[in-house]
């Protein structure tokens, strides 16, 4: 996995330029790379993204040194795992309305002990390649590295969500919020 380019830019005090997709297009990913974008964001809630499309987009984007983020169809662990296991390094969780929903969402994005993400066998876990994982110091160190490279954004899209904003912002693991 590559370092999360959005978080890297943030740490450097710079703005990351993110190219948004509502449909899968490897050609647009390549054009975004040549145009100087730092990352790709896939709208999996309103767009046309299968897990295979996300996998291919991650492969091409990472090859150009760009991270991929995605808004998942819903914030269930099922969808979050499908996207993260393919190499997505940032998740936007739609329709967050309460502190508990925000906590469950963050937990699904992070490996233990910070969260409850399960260990898959795809790009997001280096395909369980023991040699590659040993480059990070083993599975536990890789999980720590992955957690530190994860962008977790709660999307507030309702009056109850905005009414609970302070509580939502108190959730450990959230990187930020966005409106909708």
Describe each region flagged by the PLM:
Residues 19, 32, 43, 91, ...:
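Conserved, mostly hydrophobic/aromatic
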